[in-house]
Amino acid sequence: MNEENLLWGKELKQIFTALLVVGLFSGSAYAMGPTKKYEACMKQTGNVLSEIDACMSKEYKAQKKRLKKVFKPYLAKAPAEEQGLVKQSHQQWLAQRDQICNNKPIVKNEKTELQRISCLMQMTQTRADMYEARTGRISK
């Protein structure tokens, strides 16, 4: 095995460990954290990068939908005079997430795409978790 594959194996292990930790601390009694479909999908990937990417892409779409859903009660809970600021803050966060996760790699390949989608998925999930925790509402 060459050095690049060994390094990528370590990076992949770190990604999976981070996802596991997020899942453990998000509380499975709530709808917070990764979806059950995502967890099942990841178990079936056999560590094949294209399959991992497909699972993460589906989960990112699910977390984006969840973020939109949980933002509404979060916004409604804010005092009327602060709702404009809450919307602005949310838009700034979306732009920051996209800037962080969509940075242009020197070399674009399957590994960098996996890192990009993992970043988008994790940041979106974490923000949706925060909105849920602050409103006390649980998305279904």
Language-model features and meaning:
Residues 9, 21, 46-49:
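Intrinsically disordered, low-complexity regions
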Residues 1-2, 86:
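Intrinsically disordered, low-complexity regions enriched in Ser/Pro/Gly/Gln/His and often acidic
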Residues 14-18, 118:
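Hydrophobic alpha-helical context, especially transmembrane and signal-peptide helices
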Residues 6, 18-19, 32:
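Low-complexity, intrinsically disordered regions enriched in charged/polar residues
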Residues 2-4, 9-15:
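Positively charged n-region of N-terminal signal peptides that target proteins for export
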Residues 18-26:
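Bacterial N-terminal signal peptides
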Residues 30-140:
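N-terminal alpha-helical modules
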